[in-house]
Structures are given as structure tokens and as C-alpha cells.
């Protein structure tokens, strides 16, 4: 399926479009399967989306929230993706705590915590070993270097094909991350990308040929739909 690429006039419009993307797909999942599953991204770009979601009247008891990656820090650390999403969104709505599925970071062993989260996903989605569950929606961001989730250029995480969760590495700091095959099983993947600093990476990602080891977001080719929401600064060079 060819990706959908929308270049929007500014970040505010990007967030408004993202809000519609999220709410319509989660509502559709609930109507079809009785619940909706979403995996969140970190960083600055999605924060206003999470704040907007906090103002929505959704059937929170039917929505399950996961994370696509997490810095290996405590939940009260300023860099925690879970902390950001809770403060901006999840703590503001009446979602059952059992529906919130953060990546564990307390074992002092990222490999152990990666396995723990993998086991949680396998149990929740009722999949056997070697099988990958299909999230209804995975939100992703993009780094200036072309990374997404915690899948960084030329790192071992890019070659993991038999796990749901692995350990990424950024400047010697471990992170937990969804693997490429898990992301690619999703029904919908939505990238949120803002800022002129992303232009070079986007050019390589959408080029006819480029090295995905250098620009890992090129590996993201889901079985479902792939949507890129870009603000004008990021997508300036991608306009037809």
C-alpha cells in the first residue's frame, strides 16, 4: 500500500489532522473489535496531540494505550515518554489504570525489561511465540538522523526479526523499543514530523534508493496503512 503523505501549513493544522486520524481509527477499531489499541511516541511533536486527546469524549474503558519506545529512566524522570503522556493526556481522563501499559524500566536490566514487556504484549494480544500482534494504530516520530522509535542508524536493533521488543541504544544509553516487524504488523502507522531540521532525513526516506541502515524509518512498511503528517517546514521539499 502506497503511503499517504500530507504536508500541512503549520504544526497546529498537523495536530488537528492527527487528532482526526487517531480518533477515527480508534473509534473504528472499537466498533469492529470491541477495543482499540494505540502505541505512543515520545518527543515534543506529539505532546499537543495528547493534550487534545485529553479533551475528547471517548470510551476510555475500551482503549488500551502502549508505548512504542521508552528511555530507560524512571517514570518520574523528565525524559520519560510515559511521564509526558500521562501529564498531557492519560492523567486527565477517566481511563482505567489497567488499560495503560507502560514499558517497564525498573529491573536495572533493559534486556530483562524488554522480555517482560514482550511477554505482556503476547499475553494481551493472545499471540504465540514467533507471532506478531497487530496494533490498531502506532504513532511514530522522526529524528533528524532518520531514526524512529528507538531504532537508530547502524545499531543491532535494526536487525532483530524474531522479537516484539528489543533494546535500542542512543549514545550509550539503552532504550526499549518496538522491533521493525512488530511496527510493520500494524493496521495503521502514523508519522508526525515537524520542523525544517527533518528535511534531509525525509528526502532520503522518500528517495527511490537509500540505505535503510542509515535512515531506519525506511524500514517502516506496514501491512496496513502508512500515513505521514508533515508540517510545511518539514515537508517543504516533498511538495509535488
Curated annotation (Swiss-Prot):
Signal peptide span: none
EC code: 3.1.1.31
Stated name of the protein: 6-phosphogluconolactonase
Reported function: Hydrolysis of 6-phosphogluconolactone to 6-phosphogluconate.
One GO molecular-function entry: 6-phosphogluconolactonase activity
Pfam families per UniProt: Glucosamine_iso
GO annotation (BP), single: pentose-phosphate shunt
